[in-house]
Each structure stands twice: as C-alpha cells, then as structure tokens.
Amino acid sequence: MQSATTLDLPWLRHTFGKRLQENVPLARLTSARVGGKAALFITAESADDLANIVDHLWNSNTPFLIMGGGSNMLVGDAGVRAVVVFNRARKVRFDVAGVPASVWAESGANFGLIARQAAKRGLSGLEWAAGIPGTVGGAVVGNAGAHKGELSGNLLVAEILHQEKSDALRATQSGEREAGHRREYWSVERFGYRYRTSILKQIPGRHVVLSASLRLEHSSPEKVKAKIEEFVSYRRQTQPPGASMGSMFKNPAGDYAGRLIEAAGLKGKKIGRAEISPLHANFFINHGGATAEDIWKLIQLTRDAVEKKFGIVLELEIEPVGEW
C-alpha cells in the first residue's frame, strides 16, 4: 500500500470535493474499537456511487480500502495511509413471488438485518446469518458462515466491478489515465468458494462487490423467527459480549481453533486491555482502551503457542490492514 505522502491530494480533492475527508478516526467504525485514522475517507451511498468512486481510484492508480461493517478487520494503530471508502450502499429488495424467492441487496447492507427482514416475510434460508454483524459485500468475499450455513449456499448471483489487469491503465485523449475494468454478474460457481475464502479474497484489490442476490425459501414468519432465536440464543451462551472481531482464526481441518487455544493454556490471557476470552478462546476482547498492537501481540503469542504444542499453524480469519 502506498504512503499517504504519494497520494495525489490536489487531484483527489478536485475529483471528490467536500466528500473527501482527511484524518478520519476508524476505531469507531470497527467492531473491535481499535485502530488509527484514515489518511483520506469518502462515503459511498449506493452501489452505483461505489462503482463510480472505485472507477476514479483505479483510473488514477490510487490505493484504497473498502470498509463495510468493520467486523472482520484489525486496523493498525498508525491508521490507513490510503483512501478508505466507507460502504453505505444499503438498498434491499425482496422478491417474494420469484422462483426461487430471493433478496437483492447492495453490498453495504447489514447481513444479519437482512436475515431478520426475511423472517418477517416468512422467508427462510438465512437464519444462520441473523447474528452476523458484517455486510453483504464482506460475506460474499469471505464466504461468511455460521451454524453449518455459508453464503455460498445462498448466493445466486453477485454484481462485481472487475479490474482486468493492473497494467491495463492507458492514457485517454485528455491525458487522463483510464483502467480496463467492467461490471460483471458472477454466478456462485465463479467465486471458487471454500471455507471462509473465495477468489476475491485470494486476489485482493482486483474486484469490488456491488450487490448480490440470495436464494430464499417460503416458510412462515413464526418458524423462521423461532430458528433465528435458537441460533441467537446459542451464540449468546457460547460467544462473549463486548468489542471483538468475532472468530479470530479459521478452524483447522478436523479441529477447532478455540479448542486448540484453550488447550494451549491461553484462555483469559491478557496483554494491555486486550484479552483472549475466558468464554470462547477464539474471541479476543477489547475491554476498553486496548490497542491494535495489544491484539496483534496476542495473535502472535497464540500462533506460537499452538504451533509449539500441536504443530498446527493457525490461519487468521480476520484481516489486518493499515500501518503498524
């Protein structure tokens, strides 16, 4: 990621005007409540607006980071030396009469809220997602899942803004730079989904999720709401409250990250104001005043301890971003 000092500030200010903000604190926008400031910050209000912003940033070869719910992201204490695009594209539209029934949502829409809206309409299929705090876009990129459900099991099609090649920049007649990119509709097969990953996650920076259509099934509001409450109740009993990023590590094949961390004797371990939860060892809690560095030190301590005891290298489920 380029340094903020290399960003073309005059061009960015001219292009985005008063929409472009500088030195914006990011901690309040993340579920862990840690991290520094965004050097530059702009809010996308719709999928078309998001596409337009990204078009400009790609065309100018400007580094950027898209932030949605901030629930799976650890922002460094020194902040993000790039343009942070805050995704507030949140339109949602249900098709109850369709075959199958479905919901279309822009990528900044809250995934858990959509599951509850579906329940009110007697539409099932997303009950597993009711407790997920992230956005539709993040779910599409990371193949979000819970309670044996995954995004890949619901996705019908997603609209993707695709940058073909980083060397596709070319000069226009006016002298401006223009990138080779286009809007495409991807079926679920194209994403190469596996456990908590996709082609979009494996090749970062080349694709932006604009919207997605998800498969639903007809049921009754009572049945769907009952299933949601069952899942939510289970989450309350097994997952700690407080500021966290959710599951810190992916579960290794045939085992659970939380079990390994607990067996390594790290439940309740604290560094600064950050703690490995005594309730569920795969959750790292900010008790107020923790830094990203505190959490990162716990991550490294955990990885080292689990590898030493079990020979297993835990893979992060969250994404560290920014400067450290």
Identify what each model region corresponds to.
Residues Q21-E22, R28-T30, M73, L161-K165, ...:
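Phosphate/pyrophosphate- and phosphate-bearing ligand-binding catalytic cores of soluble enzymes
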Residues S60, M67-G69, N154, G242-A243, ...:
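Short, basic and Ser/Thr-rich N-terminal targeting/leader segments
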Residues A118, V136, V140-A144, E159-H162, ...:
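Short, well-ordered alpha-helical segments in soluble proteins
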Residues G36, I42-A47, L74-V92, V141-E164, ...:
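Structural signature of FAD isoalloxazine-binding scaffolds in flavoprotein oxidoreductases
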Residues Q2-V140, A144:
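Anion-binding (especially nucleotide phosphate/pyrophosphate-binding) glycine-rich loop
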